[in-house]
A protein has these predicted regions:
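Nucleic-acid endonuclease domains
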Residues: 1-75, 80-144
Length: 144
């Protein structure tokens, strides 16, 4: 799965990212000395994959706090975007650490996208599923 962020419904994409960035910025614990602009840029980068899945694949927002999306089968999925293949193991380790903190209610399904900040090109790296120890690659495609 490949897409370019310019294909997204701009109004939906920007409003969604601005809402989350505002929420992050509103608390010292999540703001962490970052400017609103910095938080917005980071949020836009990550939200492109989420907006695409909503717009093109029929996914919906998971309205619970700090959760990403609900897939077409009604399952909660976590969406992560990173800059290159070299960074995927680190993304998986962070997700595994979060999953082991059971109070978080971290989803069993994780999608990792590679996003190019300069070109706005995104590509699915993989769909990973929790096996009670770690996230394991299930597929390089999303079935819709």
């Amino acid at each position: 799965m490949k897409f370019n962020a310019t294909e997204l419904n701009r109004e939906f994409y920007l409003n969604r990212a601005e809402n989350e960035a505002s929420e992050i910025y509103s608390k010292d614990s999540t703001r962490r000395n970052r400017t609103f602009q910095n938080i917005l840029e980071t949020t836009l980068y990550g939200h492109a994959a989420e907006a695409y899945l909503i717009q093109e694949c029929g996914y919906s927002d998971d309205d619970r706090k700090y959760k990403d999306l609900i897939d077409i089968k009604g399952r909660s999925v976590e969406i992560k975007v990173t800059e290159g293949e070299y960074y995927v193991p680190y993304v998986l380790k962070r997700a595994e650490k979060a999953k082991l903190q059971t109070w978080r209610g971290y989803p069993d399904i994780l999608y990792v996208f590679i996003g190019n900040r300069k070109t706005a090109d995104y590509e699915l790296n993989g769909v990973y599923k929790w096996n009670n120890e770690r996230f394991v690659l299930q597929s390089n495609e999303i079935s819709v």
